[in-house]
Amino acid sequence: MLKFVILLSAVACALGGTIPEGLLPQLDGRIVGGTATTISSFPWQISLQRSGSHSCGGSIYTDRVIVTAAHCLQSVSASSLQIRAGSSYWSSGGVTVKVSSFKNHEGYNPNTMVNDIAVIRLSSSLGFSSTIKSISLASSNPANGAAASVSGWGTQSSGSSSIPSQLQYVNVNIVSQSKCASSAYGYGSEIRNTMICAAASGKDACQGDSGGPLVSGGVLVGVVSWGYGCAYSNYPGVYASVADLRSWVINNA
């Protein structure tokens, strides 16, 4: 969960008009309209913590590597980070492991949010169990409309500064790159080939914890990246596309 919003008035000059329609990416990881769940249903989910407080979500790729979003790891040192795995609660239970290092995608651009992916290396190995499991990386993007789920400890309402203690999830449907960039939605050319979208029909839900998992067909298909807020039906949640960034993750894990 990233507790800030990039405001138009603050950064319009810096972006130099790269974002059309006068809108800027809003990084406000949250699960709105979600349901409490247990870690056994999402055993790859971790809480990325900065100085002991939850800051982002992530997914277990191997027993020593976590996949998360690059925007979660800006202006932070590895020594201040740890992860909690194997617990439905971000503040207790399971196991905590210190972060030894991390690497952001070299092509990550905070203005366009392209290549918004990173790998975290742990100081010791996770012991796999029914509540701590790795998840495979998608090798191709799911079809438009495919069922998916997103999980995390994001704030449950727009503008809220508090987060739930228990893991939340929401069911969504994939919106393909081409569909998300089409006139059916409002993003247009902001959707790049390293992104995939998802939306929840009939719910006020768009995205979960920043850096957290979007899962479809039992594999990791997306990493929660950005969006224009859950109130707008023509702006789905936007995720880093794992299929398009798979090679980078494998080569840098």
Curated annotation (Swiss-Prot):
InterPro entries: Peptidase_S1, Peptidase_S1_PA, Peptidase_S1_PA_chymotrypsin, Peptidase_S1A, Trypsin_dom, TRYPSIN_HIS, TRYPSIN_SER. Pfam families: Trypsin (PF00089). The active site is at H71 (charge relay system), D116 (charge relay system), S210 (charge relay system). Residues 23-30 form a propeptide. GO terms for biological process: proteolysis. The record marks D204 as: Required for specificity. GO terms for molecular function: serine-type endopeptidase activity. Belongs to the peptidase S1 family. This is Trypsin beta.
